[in-house]
A protein has these predicted regions:
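Carbohydrate-active catalytic/glycan-binding domains of CAZyme proteins
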Residues: 1-149
Length: 149
């Protein structure tokens, strides 16, 4: 419907806040959610697929990768429910940067941080799919980005 939202960490990263933006996207109109209070989630990335919204987040561990988790909602202002694990215990050594829906195919783009030489940090790309309402991240050594175009 063209409504834009801004998601940020709040209370020293203890919570995630979801704000609805004004029609021109220049101002916050309303705080619509305080998500997972006290859970210390960061790096929120949202994608819509099959009329559902999926948000992937990570735990606040600085440069160290950790278990990514996701939640599902019927709308950005709806109930996000419980966090569920995605990927392996380190989200395949990454942290969500953004999610893409390219021609109906879902793609996770993650930061792969290098704590000792941050300027050598890079990105990874992993296919995502929805199976029976659950978001699944497919590990692969290489992702052919050409098939998404």
């Amino acid at each position: 419907d063209g409504t834009a939202y801004f998601i940020s960490a709040a209370r020293d990263n203890a919570d995630l806040h979801v704000y609805r933006l004004s029609e021109d996207y220049l101002n916050v109109e309303k705080l619509v959610h305080r998500l997972w209070q006290g859970e210390y989630r960061e790096a929120p990335s949202v994608i819509k697929s099959e009329e559902k919204y999926y948000m992937i987040t990570s735990f606040c561990t600085g440069w160290a990768p950790n278990q990514g988790k996701y939640a599902v909602a019927d709308s950005m202002e709806g109930d996000w429910g419980m966090l569920k694990k995605i990927g392996d215990e380190t989200t395949y050594q990454s942290q969500a940067a953004f999610l893409l829906n390219l021609n109906g195919q879902l793609l996770y783009i993650g930061d792969r941080w290098n704590a000792e030489n941050y300027f050598e940090s890079g990105y990874v790309a992993y296919p995502l799919k929805v199976e029976n309402g659950e978001l699944v991240m497919e590990y692969c050594e290489e992702t052919d980005l050409g098939k998404y175009l």
